[in-house]
Design a protein with these regions (language model features):
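Conserved alpha/beta-domain cores
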Residues: 1-240
Length: 240
């Protein structure tokens, strides 16, 4: 409240006004940063200051923070938020009198972002597929509510497995491949990964390897499985 020159009650009123009926598809991610750029400023400062502190303590470490802008659906909104991030980061680095490289990329978790990946890739250093939300957005059902009907889908052989546990390679996977095929020609240095529970599923890891992803991330307890699956995928289908 003091930082914004507002009363505590005014801050509480703002928080109350942000209540939504469908927050999954509402005012979140980079939409918040467009409406309240000070949030992006605050978060960027935190990332860069932390990186600078680590760099000072460990000058022998290779450090290059990656700032990921979430929920992009339109290149223009990404560019608006990226401008805030870059200006803030550069100012913090200049004030500290240090040299620090950093990257700014985006989470790809909305189908439209996959369809327009060639535009987004022009200004993004990396893509990270958020397949939990990308699955929700593609199928049009919520991961939190799908349990009410998924068993009936299994019984009727509509689904063979939970699409939130095992990547839907036909639909969601096709969008991912499309995004890579559109993005890399305009940005050959674009590195691409996946985050979400799919990153620990062996068949999903193999699919990610086959379409050209650079890495997968997952929950800590899934890491051994993911590493083994990645090694097996490379043996089965070696990259040049």
């Amino acid at each position: 409240a003091k930082a914004k020159n507002k009363t505590v009650q005014e801050i509480k009123d703002i928080i109350t006004s942000l209540h939504e009926f469908n927050p999954m598809m509402g005012h979140r991610g980079l939409r918040l940063a467009v409406t309240y750029p000070e949030i992006a400023v605050m978060q960027t400062k935190a990332v860069i200051r932390a990186a600078i502190n680590v760099q000072k303590k460990h000058p022998d470490w290779k450090l290059e923070p990656e700032i990921m802008i979430p929920l992009t659906s339109e290149v223009k909104e990404f560019n608006v938020v990226k401008k805030v991030v870059v200006e803030t980061a550069d100012e913090e680095i200049k004030k500290a009198g240090v040299k620090l490289a950093y990257q700014v990329g985006t989470m790809i978790e909305i189908p439209r972002a996959c369809l327009t990946a060639d535009e987004i890739a022009k200004n993004a250093d990396f893509f990270c597929f958020g397949t939990n939300d990308l699955t929700q957005m593609t199928f049009g059902f919520s991961r939190d509510d799908a349990g009410k009907f998924l068993n009936s889908y299994y019984d009727n052989k509509i689904f063979e497995s939970d699409p939130f546990a095992k990547l839907d390679q036909v639909g969601v996977g096709k969008l991912m491949k499309m995004a890579i095929d559109l993005g890399r020609p305009v940005n050959p240095h674009l590195h691409v990964g996946i985050c979400g529970e799919h990153g620990g599923d062996p068949s999903s890891v193999e699919f990610c390897h086959n379409i050209g992803l650079d890495y997968v991330s997952c929950s800590p307890f899934r890491v051994p499985v993911a590493r083994l699956a990645a090694a097996q995928a490379e043996i089965k289908n070696p990259r040049k």
